[in-house]
């Protein structure tokens, strides 16, 4: 069989996205900056009223000295910008690769092997790992429910496919570390699938959610069956 290789780095249809930011490390500093900005607006408005008016309520209310307010604003703005830059630096980059290889299921039979890697420089931790199957000829409904690797394997078995012979699915539990690959491209096995499986399954989606070192949560949905018909090497932009 002609070898087909498919890289899933940055494909537009299954692009990685940030779905949640850390409340402590992102939301709290941002709220503090907004509050200080509101205080600044109040003090600027108060400074433009007459001295006589400032002797009456509410204009006589001084929340904070201008010098201290300026320093706090500079610190808060710097913290928000530094956090944003650091989050970009340590952001994980999930990628996947599929290739026809031998020895994954039966010794001499070709199987479609799919692996995942973290192309970033820093560690990320698995938060959740879910799957969804679309059999050949079935409708691919975007709102279909997700299930665990175990329930997905049971669904495939009920469809007549044999675990260990037609497919092999790897479960990644919450807390599993995905080490940054650096300059390498070695992948961690997600699953292997026989030619019979490929003929009977239209799509096998894997939804991966990971948490980076600053507490942000990222998600990527990968179709393990994508690119099987390609020949030669192909890389998504």
Tell me what each language-model feature is.
Residues 133-151:
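Short aromatic-acidic-glycine turn motif
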Residues 146-194:
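Intrinsically disordered, low-complexity Pro/Gly/Ser/Thr-rich segments with frequent PxxP/GP/PP motifs
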